[in-house]
Amino acid sequence: MAYQGSGSHSPPHYDDNGHRLQDLPHGSYEEEASRGLLSHQQGPFTGPFDDPQQHGSSTTRPVSGYSLSETYAPEAAYHDPYTQPSPGSVYSAQSAENPAAAFGVPGRVASPYARSDTSSTEAWRQRQAPGGGPGGLRRYATRKVKLVQGSVLSVDYPVPSAIQNAIQAKYRNDLEGGSEEFTHMRYTAATCDPNEFTLHNGYNLRPAMYNRHTELLIAITYYNEDKTLTSRTLHGVMQNIRDIVNLKKSEFWNKGGPAWQKIVVCLVFDGIDPCDKDTLDVLATIGVYQDGVMKRDVDGKETVAHIFEYTTQLSVTPNQQLIRPTDDGPSTLPPVQMMFCLKQKNSKKINSHRWLFNAFGRILNPEVCILLDAGTKPGPKSLLSLWEAFYNDKDLGGACGEIHAMLGKGWKNLINPLVAAQNFEYKISNILDKPLESSFGYVSVLPGAFSAYRFRAIMGRPLEQYFHGDHTLSKQLGKKGIEGMNIFKKNMFLAEDRILCFELVAKAGSKWHLTYVKASKAETDVPEGAPEFISQRRRWLNGSFAAGIYSLMHFGRMYKSGHNIVRMFFLHIQMLYNIFSTVLTWFSLASYWLTTTVIMDLVGTPSDNNGNKAFPFGKTATPIINTIVKYVYLGFLLLQFILALGNRPKGSKFSYLASFVVFGIIQVYVVIDALYLVVRAFSGSAPMDFTTDQGVGEFLKSFFSSSGAGIIIIALAATFGLYFVASFMYLDPWHMFTSFPAYMCVQSSYINILNVYAFSNWHDVSWGTKGSDKADALPSAKTTKDEGKEVVIEEIDKPQADIDSQFEATVKRALTPYVPPVEKEEKTLEDSYKSFRTRLVTFWIFSNAFLAVCITSDGVDKFGFTNSATDRTQRFFQALLWSNAVVALFRFIGACWFLGKTGLMCCFARR
């Protein structure tokens, strides 16, 4: 809920003017996301659970009265939509300019900082030094921290007072005496491989330390998303956890302890270098991260992952509003157990999942793991719906929900044809493809951006095969790892989620199946530009094709599973369906060209079947235009191979954009021709090749044996007609009106541009890791032995007041409105060279092709040539022979001249 402060608890420079607490109705996600939450007591602590000293902090720490009492974001004032806004609820001009002025935080000019190459990164590096902060380096007292088993560094750090104060007293009262769950953040420097992160080696996690059963482990994998995308996912997850905690009649969640203690959220960041440092400020604001605590190595042994743990009730919305609890209403967020794993180096998503499953999963032993990508926002009760599918089906091994494109406010993103086409593609996949595969029991792909697995179902061979794609295991696995794979297998692991799905269903001795949960929905952002779209689909298409072939080749392993005869029967049907689909995909390039030419010839070439008429430009102009369209189609198709074999999509942005436009125009032209064909067929204005006056039986027989317009009508009805019918059956038809036209325009580009680029770059598997120099900013941990001969390290001991003052600056940075970075459109020197090469090769090929077509093709006779192709070929051949003869004669004359000149010079040369 959002609240601007009230009564005596407000900062002195605010006038509340009777502003009251706004209770949000349960489930009003959009309203809640637009409100900032800002109310808590200030000044001295009012109870024993408000004082951090009561929870194990150092007794020498002075009491801080700091609390989260305002939103730091400008323009954050909330206006009640049902009442007139009161003057006191709106910030003064001074507050709007510098909302943190009440806490002594200087104003900061917003700048388009982002990701890993600008000033925010440099500032982050400076804050990692011991004692580093807004005031520069300081010298603090130190404390000695004993290492677990003499090698594992695991330290508890006090969280800022404001974060402690945000936890509701009823949760703190329920904790065991001496617990530091809400008062301290736990940091562990993991200097081992994920497989070695075990209790035996001294590593542990808080939920296991508190002897809690983990039913649901929610994982968010992250690469370099900005703080808005990350907040969108994290806030959506916390709202979903609230849905679960608020269940009143649950037979499961309300037994054996509070529901929130059975849920763990794990964020896995793939490397310090690509990570957006502003996102770390958001995590620090909710208490799950702190600057200056990470260690680059422990006694020279490099840290592989930095693990933070904290249980928080705070959240930050995508528009940088701080949400915290104020009452016991249904809209209040419950405590959420969070783990934040920041890998030191970028080592790809499969390695992130290895940390999740092999390291954290084996310690927590969850029943269900839900996987999300940063930027994917789960809808209301989506995670609950996914979990319920597992709870109600003991043989369910994996599930996924519906992913739809993020359309923006008022569906404004649909103005972009690429976004609209992808929206239609996602919708039809969720209406036709996923339900079909779910009926068979084998969903070929559970998207990594939004899916769930039963942990014990994927343990063993499924995860073992899945992790063969982790390049950090290449030396350990040898020939079975990435280094020993051929190019086909490497492409297969570009769609690693498909491998996991197949291995799960084919698991020996088990009868796990996969399903699609329609009630579970999530939205994700999709590429809006042609280069990004092409690059994304290159990985998807190559990976899915290779993984599909893999599943067909290894289908025999299904016989070792525990599926019953009915399930096996349907799995065989699905296998035949997949084979048929693969064949159609393989020949799609030729199929699209033939479909285009056949339809244009049926309506554009005058014949007895169409009454010697031609549509749409008349029988004289239409054949000429159709011929031009065919040559343009083939020309741009050839261009795709030239571009794909030598250029990056970002380096040929204009060429690809032009290709999308040209193929879109041709597609519209063909659709108009097809509709005209259908209209003529049913209007009776043209003879058809099926009978309508000899009964239903004869009609169906002639209709389905049709070889002309009838078969085209069948194809149109079987695709477009079914799209409409199925969409209305699922009560979700809007994409047919908002996105279907755009999809029709882009449909041919899916084949002619995306498939060509993907297959032409089959060699690009992008397995290399990026270098990481950001870890150099982290300090090292050196151990010593104390008087008791125990291995310890010396760690700084910050006063609570300094922790709070540094936190003020952190919150200010986190809640500063996000400014998207300005992407540089400049081409690299290599891109410029490749572009020139592409233009040169394109001009050379097309000019030669143009000459060959003009000479040999009968189709150009329509352009007014007075002679036939045979005559033109004969004359060209004559001209070519004469030209070669003239050139040879010219060369001979030159040789004779040189020989004569040399002879004369020999006669008169001085010796």
Swiss-Prot record:
<keyword id="KW-1133">Transmembrane helix</keyword>
<keyword id="KW-1003">Cell membrane</keyword>
<dbReference type="GO" id="GO:0071555">
    <property type="term" value="P:cell wall organization"/>
</dbReference>
<keyword id="KW-0328">Glycosyltransferase</keyword>
<dbReference type="InterPro" id="IPR029044">
    <property type="entry name" value="Nucleotide-diphossugar_trans"/>
</dbReference>
<dbReference type="InterPro" id="IPR013616">
    <property type="entry name" value="Chitin_synth_N"/>
</dbReference>
<keyword id="KW-0472">Membrane</keyword>
<feature type="transmembrane region" description="Helical">
    <location>
        <begin position="840"/>
        <end position="860"/>
    </location>
</feature>
<dbReference type="InterPro" id="IPR004835">
    <property type="entry name" value="Chitin_synth"/>
</dbReference>
<dbReference type="Pfam" id="PF01644">
    <property type="entry name" value="Chitin_synth_1"/>
</dbReference>
<feature type="compositionally biased region" description="Polar residues">
    <location>
        <begin position="54"/>
        <end position="66"/>
    </location>
</feature>
<feature type="transmembrane region" description="Helical">
    <location>
        <begin position="879"/>
        <end position="899"/>
    </location>
</feature>
<feature type="region of interest" description="Disordered">
    <location>
        <begin position="107"/>
        <end position="138"/>
    </location>
</feature>
<dbReference type="GO" id="GO:0071944">
    <property type="term" value="C:cell periphery"/>
</dbReference>
<feature type="transmembrane region" description="Helical">
    <location>
        <begin position="659"/>
        <end position="679"/>
    </location>
</feature>
<dbReference type="GO" id="GO:0048315">
    <property type="term" value="P:conidium formation"/>
</dbReference>
<keyword id="KW-0812">Transmembrane</keyword>
<dbReference type="GO" id="GO:0004100">
    <property type="term" value="F:chitin synthase activity"/>
</dbReference>
<feature type="region of interest" description="Disordered">
    <location>
        <begin position="1"/>
        <end position="66"/>
    </location>
</feature>
<keyword id="KW-0961">Cell wall biogenesis/degradation</keyword>
<feature type="transmembrane region" description="Helical">
    <location>
        <begin position="624"/>
        <end position="644"/>
    </location>
</feature>
<dbReference type="GO" id="GO:0030448">
    <property type="term" value="P:hyphal growth"/>
</dbReference>
<dbReference type="GO" id="GO:0030428">
    <property type="term" value="C:cell septum"/>
</dbReference>
<keyword id="KW-0808">Transferase</keyword>
<feature type="transmembrane region" description="Helical">
    <location>
        <begin position="579"/>
        <end position="599"/>
    </location>
</feature>
<comment type="similarity">
    <text>Belongs to the chitin synthase family. Class III subfamily.</text>
</comment>
<feature type="transmembrane region" description="Helical">
    <location>
        <begin position="711"/>
        <end position="731"/>
    </location>
</feature>
<feature type="compositionally biased region" description="Basic and acidic residues">
    <location>
        <begin position="12"/>
        <end position="34"/>
    </location>
</feature>
<comment type="function">
    <text>Polymerizes chitin, a structural polymer of the cell wall and septum, by transferring the sugar moiety of UDP-GlcNAc to the non-reducing end of the growing chitin polymer.</text>
</comment>
<dbReference type="InterPro" id="IPR004834">
    <property type="entry name" value="Chitin_synth_fun"/>
</dbReference>
<dbReference type="Pfam" id="PF08407">
    <property type="entry name" value="Chitin_synth_1N"/>
</dbReference>
<dbReference type="GO" id="GO:0005886">
    <property type="term" value="C:plasma membrane"/>
</dbReference>
<dbReference type="GO" id="GO:0006031">
    <property type="term" value="P:chitin biosynthetic process"/>
</dbReference>
<protein>
    <recommendedName>
        <fullName>Chitin synthase G</fullName>
        <ecNumber>2.4.1.16</ecNumber>
    </recommendedName>
</protein>
